[in-house]
């Protein structure tokens, strides 16, 4: 049975912005929806929390552009910045090149990868909080969303990623015809703590010969769940295991984060399109 045909107590199917989405009123219904896809899929199914239902699913590096020239320009600048980290951080010699870009994405760089998680409650937290950045992009703060008439829901995307192939030479890396997937808890050293705290994985779509990587990854969306924001806050409660301090461990605890912050790699205003390793207020 297709996901869009399932019937779960405590939920109903609705249409919003061209999507058929599952509107969930009970926490058990949320868990059942997530579990159904994971059990019935031949691919890996993961979660991504969103505050808004967007028509596209773009990685941060590709947002706000539409031309190949702009795409390749950003990719070139991003790769140059990654190489700067490789040159000055000996930690990058402790893992393979395939993990460098997704790791830096996890700490703030804008890349071709998208963050996903395999814990539904972590995804829900990201759907309930919004990130606020200083103008220069260096300092990041998360704040609780305010429930009002235009800000009533949290969304969780269910994302499919290929698991057909993996290599012993690439721990934590899977790929198939459509996507690549990296689990940083395996691919990167454990002193990079944030991926473990967030149950963090990343995926990206593969390109086709002659056209390159697509700007929009929405072809991998397998379902969308909507939760009333007020109920989502109630389900999350006030526990410390899912909160800013635990999901974004300070550099005092996250030695990998400290290495990046102390690397000496600089970011200038012209680097805005490729992001920065943020200092997160926790």
Where are each of the predicted segments found?
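Catalytic-core elements of nucleic-acid end-processing and repair enzymes
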Residues: 1-282
């Amino acid at each position: 049975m297709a996901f869009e045909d399932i019937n779960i107590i405590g939920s109903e199917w609705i249409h919003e912005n061209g999507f058929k989405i599952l509107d969930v009123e009970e926490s058990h219904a949320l868990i059942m929806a997530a579990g159904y896809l994971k059990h019935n899929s031949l691919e890996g199914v993961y979660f991504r929390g969103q505050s808004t239902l967007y028509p596209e699913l773009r990685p941060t590096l590709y947002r706000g552009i539409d031309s190949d020239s702009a795409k390749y320009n950003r990719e070139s600048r991003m790769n140059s910045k990654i190489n700067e980290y490789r040159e000055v951080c000996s930690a990058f010699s402790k893992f393979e090149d395939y993990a460098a870009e997704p790791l830096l994405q996890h700490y703030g760089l804008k890349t071709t990868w998208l963050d996903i998680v395999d814990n539904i409650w972590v995804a829900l937290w990201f759907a309930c909080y919004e990130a606020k950045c200083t103008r220069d992009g260096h300092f990041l703060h998360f704040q609780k969303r305010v429930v009002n008439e235009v800000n009533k829901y949290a969304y969780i995307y269910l994302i499919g990623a290929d698991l057909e192939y993996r290599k012993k030479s690439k721990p934590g890396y899977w790929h198939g015809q459509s996507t690549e997937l990296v689990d940083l808890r395996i691919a990167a050293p454990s002193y990079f703590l944030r991926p473990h705290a967030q149950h963090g994985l990343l995926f990206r779509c593969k390109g086709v010969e002659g056209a390159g990587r697509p700007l929009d990854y929405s072809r991998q969306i397998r379902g969308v769940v909507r939760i009333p924001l007020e109920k989502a806050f109630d389900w999350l409660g006030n526990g410390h295991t899912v909160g800013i301090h635990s999901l974004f461990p300070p550099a005092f605890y996250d030695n990998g984060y400290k290495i990046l912050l102390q690397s000496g790699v600089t970011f200038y205003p012209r680097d805005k399109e490729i992001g920065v390793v943020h200092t997160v207020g926790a």
